[in-house]
Design a protein with these regions (language model features):
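Substrate-binding/catalytic groove segments of enzymes
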Residues: 5-6, 63-64, 122-127, 168-172, ...
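Active-site-adjacent helix/loop patches that line small-molecule binding or acyl-intermediate pockets
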Residues: 1-85, 109-113, 117-121
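Active-site Gly/Thr loop motif
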Residues: 85-90, 137-202, 206-209
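Solvent-exposed loop and edge beta-strand segments that line ligand/cofactor-binding
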Residues: 37-46, 98-106, 179-183
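Alpha-helix boundary/capping residues
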Residues: 33, 119-122, 141-142, 216-219
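Active-site-proximal binding-pocket segments
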Residues: 74-140
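Short, gly/Ser/Thr-rich active-site loops of penicillin-recognizing serine hydrolases
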Residues: 209-223
């Protein structure tokens, strides 16, 4: 029913994916959701916004270089090589040449583990390649800015990453925000201290991981 937190996303996903050109997808993403609040007042998540971000990135990159340039090939593929990821990431799904940002990647389990582990380390290849102010906030390393409240006081969203305050579950003496990635259908990738990672992929709509984190904390303290 409409009480499902994913209803808005589920209800309109097929109509977006069925569009057969990049232009049609962009028009759909721009017009599909009626403006209900002034910008900055109400936090709303739609994966179609990541498509729009990808279109903007491609346009920016081509204006900076030339019309044949491609931000995925030119920027991301070299980063994937540096991270030692598998060749399945070399070519994303596309729509008339535009990377299908938001949905278009195929990854091996080892790719997930490598990316997540590097993200959770304070010093990694991402230190050189990403805007450090935005990255630190996304990784919850900037206590003054935890991000937008999402559903409850223990959940935040910041620069593309979710975060959960695990302090009450783990009985920490102070806040312990764990960044995590969440994917459609039942995907969770939780970034733990010092390069540790918990990830779970399913199609069953299961997003719970607090019990697992509590168990991991008993063997390798997270607080």
């Amino acid at each position: 029913g409409t009480s499902n937190p994913h209803y808005d996303e589920d209800n309109h996903l097929a109509s977006f994916l069925n569009k057969t050109s990049a232009k049609a997808k962009t028009e759909h993403a721009c017009k599909r959701y009626r403006i209900k609040q002034k910008p900055g007042e109400q936090w709303v998540y739609h994966t179609t916004e990541y498509w729009l971000l990808g279109v903007a990135m491609q346009n920016f990159w081509r204006k900076k270089h030339d019309e044949k340039s491609d931000f995925y090939t030119d920027v991301l593929n070299p980063l994937w090589r540096e991270l030692g990821l598998s060749p399945v990431l070399d070519e994303p799904h596309r729509q008339t040449g535009q990377p299908l940002t938001g949905w278009g990647l195929t990854l091996l389990r080892s790719d997930i583990a490598k990316i997540a582990s590097m993200l959770s380390l304070e010093k990694s290849v991402f230190t050189r390649h990403l805007d450090q102010s935005m990255f630190k906030k996304a990784m919850q390393r900037e206590p003054s800015d935890r991000g937008s409240v999402e559903g409850s006081e223990t959940l935040r969203f910041q620069n593309g990453f979710w975060a959960w305050d695990a302090s009450s579950v783990l009985e920490c003496k102070e806040e312990k925000w764990l960044p995590f990635m969440s994917g459609y259908g039942g995907i969770s990738v939780v970034l733990l201290p010092d390069g540790d990672v918990y990830y779970y992929f399913s199609d069953g709509g299961i997003f719970r991981f607090a019990e697992v984190i509590e168990h991991l904390n008993s063997t390798n303290p997270i607080c």
